[in-house]
């Protein structure tokens, strides 16, 4: 089996909008999803950025990072692997690779929720 090669790219506003509409609304419950306008405004102000991870031209994953200018800590705000790529270990590989892409960050803050506390059983996987 050929090893997968991924390309990391910071998404432009139009790309992020598509990811939000097509992917994020599926991947996160409405109660946890910030409005698109808030995310776009944060990115435009330099307070956040979103990585798209691609295999060739195909989006595999996205990681929305929050880091105000001058801050040495990045926060992973949203992270998802697209359904066709889940349960393959890609998520763990991408999290391990994340520090190399967060230039200038001395730490990365990751919030995780306990699956047993999920309101929706489908979201607890």
Predicted feature locations:
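A short helix-loop-beta-strand connector motif used in the catalytic cores of GNAT acetyltransferases and
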Residues: 41-52, 61
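Short amphipathic alpha-helix that is part of the acyltransferase structural core
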Residues: 1-38, 54
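A short, internal acetyl-CoA/4′-phosphopantetheine-binding micro-motif in the GNAT/acyltransferase core
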Residues: 79-86, 114-116
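Conserved acetyl-CoA-binding loop-helix of GNAT-fold acetyltransferases
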Residues: 81, 87-101
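Conserved GNAT acetyl-CoA-binding A-motif
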Residues: 102-121
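Hydrophobic, well-ordered beta-alpha structural blocks that scaffold small-molecule cofactor pockets
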Residues: 64, 96-97, 108
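Conserved beta-strand in the GNAT
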Residues: 52, 57-67, 73-80
């Amino acid at each position: 089996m050929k090893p997968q090669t991924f390309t990391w790219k910071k998404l432009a506003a139009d790309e992020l909008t598509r990811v939000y509409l097509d992917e994020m609304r599926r991947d996160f419950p409405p109660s946890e999803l910030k409005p698109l306008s808030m995310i776009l405004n944060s990115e435009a102000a330099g307070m956040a950025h979103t990585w798209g991870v691609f295999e060739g031209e195909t989006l595999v994953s996205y990681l929305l990072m929050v880091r105000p200018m001058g801050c040495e800590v990045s926060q992973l705000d949203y992270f998802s692997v697209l359904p066709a790529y889940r349960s393959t270990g890609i998520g763990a590989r991408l999290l391990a690779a994340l520090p190399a892409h967060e230039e200038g960050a001395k730490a990365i803050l990751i919030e995780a929720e306990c699956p047993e506390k999920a309101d929706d059983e489908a979201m607890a996987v």
